[in-house]
Amino acid sequence: MVARGRTCERSLNILFVINDLYTRGNGLAASARRTITLLRERGHHVRVLSAPPLDGDDCGVGVPEYPLPSMSVPVVGSLIASQGYAFARVRRAQVKRALQWADVVHLEEPFYLQAVVAQCARRAGVPALVTYHIHPENLTASIYLDRACLLNRMILELWKRAIFNRCSLVQCPSQSVWDRLEPLALRPPLLLLSNGVPLGEGVDGADARGDEGDSSVVRILAVGRFSREKDQATILRALRYSSHARSIELALAGRGPTERALRAQASALLSDGVITRPVRFAFMSAPELAREASRCDLYVHAARIEVEGLSALEVLRLGVVPVIARGPLTATSQFALSGDSMYEAGDSRALARAIDRWVERGRQALVSEGARYRGLGERYDIRACVDRLEDAYVRLVSADVSHA
């Protein structure tokens, strides 16, 4: 397949640095794989410094040219594994080999591996770009410390000193991230650039809304890793306050450490008579997710902590009306086209009211509003995003980042 984006005049040697490129169900890794694929299609030489796939599945991008052994983390190893993730053990000799080849480095995380590579790249004179993919609270939420402001500020300061200030450019995937980083007075400039979504992936044009079964059923979809910060628990609590709960059919797409608790919460709703249809839990591929979205009336995105939330956009562009959490650490509400499609993060009663408002407007109103979202993805076309990323790489290699 030939990428429809432009072709860069000069082929670059681009080194991607990520602990685990091959995990599935992780938006960071999926975004990196898409970007790597497009860059290769445009003629660039892209190599990867990462742990190899544990199950042998290279996810279509090939095994890492610079493999690192997987690292077992004491105490929290099982928690990390439950998030579908793995850390790589640093091998400085391998890092140096990779840097000898690279024109430019792209760091995908703010962890120890990236700190070492950032330091070595700076010493070797190889420019590095880092993408801000996660907040400190994405990490601390798993151990119930996401509201420990001092701790999270300390983590961000550590990232600033060990990684960000050793790079030449910091990519901010959303305005929300830019607003958080701008007051930190980082040494490198900030680049406001979405990670982007592939407009054609998983879209077959079919729309089954109202075609399946009882037209009185309200089908709601939520997508995201099952974890505290994604806050699927608020969606389930909201059903207790919804006037239309008994008409709602809810599907939660994902997997993760809170699945057991969420299933128990969903079972209680059914046994208490709050809902009449069991909540469906499933991990879906892109085509499966597209089919599910084509039959849904509403999409709910409840995450309290979200750098960009492209999983939401991949559903909305199929014409589904959203109800999205709004808060200081979540950027996903940027996709909402009206105030009626937002609620305050963590407020289950407010979410219930928002759902009820859309249900009471009727199916035709949902179809009309959903049509407004079909073109939304064009603003975040990954091909256009990679165009700008290429420009950034070229400026870094030529030591001109003043216009980033």
For the regions a language model picked out, list residue spans one by one.
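Conserved acidic donor-binding segment of nucleotide-sugar-dependent glycosyltransferases
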Residues: 337-348, 357-363
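Conserved donor-binding/catalytic core segment of Leloir-type glycosyltransferases
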Residues: 15, 171, 209-240, 251
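Aromatic "clamp/platform" in nucleotide-sugar-dependent glycosyltransferases that forms part
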Residues: 110, 304
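Membrane-proximal helix-turn-helix segments that form the acceptor-binding/catalytic region
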Residues: 123, 136, 151-169, 184
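Short alpha-helical donor nucleotide-sugar binding micro-motif in glycosyltransferases
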Residues: 99, 164, 283-284, 291-296
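Carbohydrate-associated surface elements
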Residues: 52, 176, 196
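Nucleotide-activated donor-binding/catalytic signature segment of Leloir-type glycosyltransferases, i.e.
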Residues: 260-284
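Short hydrophobic beta-strand element within catalytic cores of glycosyltransferases
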Residues: 321-326, 330
